[in-house]
């Protein structure tokens, strides 16, 4: 089955509104055809409205980096999925290892967030990935599989078919280390196999699975050549306009 590649830049806690606007203006008119590849930026909350405004009329998709599982209430500091939808956001990244590690988010939190995101007409990008210790112990498939199953519990086949799963080995995020092509393929296939076991092969064949972890313009084509890698969630290499555009060159 043909799945459209999706390259998403995750800015993390970088860029002020002025810098964000300049970036979007620099890339918006230079993107490859959206028939070939989907391109997106996950912007921090304080620049999101600026980025959405700057991206209007372009094919660039915009994601939030987090949202809560309630639409409103006494949840100081959280982002409402309802308001994100009203603003025009397309995607929400949830379950990133930094959120799990620093902010103690659980698989159950991520599952509740996924349901709230879908309830508001948005699409989640659900992150999963193992630590170096888990990887070296040979337990990566088991660990990541449990993360994926828990995150997707209770979702419909239609919902799962449309979401994105980003496999990011924690030991490769921002470290300069990157998984081998075989590692990326094997783990992204393992993610798809979990979806197939839980929701059926037809659903699994529609799910887009991204690889993330020190992806750069120099290695993105290698990963994109893998049959079960449908895109990339990219950190550092997405912070400069030229580098972000270069990540999309693999379609040429």
From Swiss-Prot:
Keyword vocabulary terms for this entry: Cytoplasm, Gluconeogenesis, Glycolysis, Isomerase
Gene3D superfamilies: Aldolase class I
PROSITE patterns reported in the protein's UniProt record: TIM_1, TIM_2
Alphabetical GO biological process terms: gluconeogenesis; glyceraldehyde-3-phosphate biosynthetic process; glycerol catabolic process; glycolytic process
The keyword Protease belongs to this UniProt entry's keyword annotation: no
Job of this protein: Involved in the gluconeogenesis. Catalyzes stereospecifically the conversion of dihydroxyacetone phosphate (DHAP) to D-glyceraldehyde-3-phosphate (G3P).
Protein's name in the database: Triosephosphate isomerase
Gene label: tpiA
């Amino acid at each position: 089955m043909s799945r459209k590649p999706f390259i998403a830049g995750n800015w993390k806690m970088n860029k002020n509104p002025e810098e964000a606007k300049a970036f979007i203006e620099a890339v918006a008119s230079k993107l490859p055809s959206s028939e070939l590849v989907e391109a997106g930026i996950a912007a921090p909350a304080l620049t999101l409205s600026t980025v959405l405004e700057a991206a209007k009329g372009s094919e660039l998709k915009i994601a939030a980096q987090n949202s809560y599982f309630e639409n409103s209430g006494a949840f100081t500091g959280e982002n409402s999925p309802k308001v994100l939808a009203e603003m025009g956001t397309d995607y929400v990244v949830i379950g990133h290892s930094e959120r799990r590690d620093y902010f103690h988010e659980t698989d159950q939190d991520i599952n509740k967030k996924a349901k709230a995101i879908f309830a508001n007409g948005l699409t989640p990008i659900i992150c999963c990935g193992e630590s170096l210790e888990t990887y070296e112990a040979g337990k990566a498939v088991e660990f990541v599989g449990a993360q994926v199953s828990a995150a997707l519990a209770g979702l419909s086949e239609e919902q799962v078919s449309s979401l994105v799963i980003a496999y990011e080995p924690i030991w490769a995020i921002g470290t300069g280390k990157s998984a081998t092509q075989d590692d990326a393929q094997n783990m992204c296939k393992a993610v798809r196999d979990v979806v197939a076991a839980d929701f059926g092969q037809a659903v699994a064949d529609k799910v887009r699975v991204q690889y993330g972890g020190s992806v750069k313009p120099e290695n993105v084509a290698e990963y994109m050549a893998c049959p079960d890698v449908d895109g990339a969630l990219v950190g550092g290499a997405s912070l400069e306009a030229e580098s972000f555009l270069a990540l999309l060159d693999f379609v040429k």
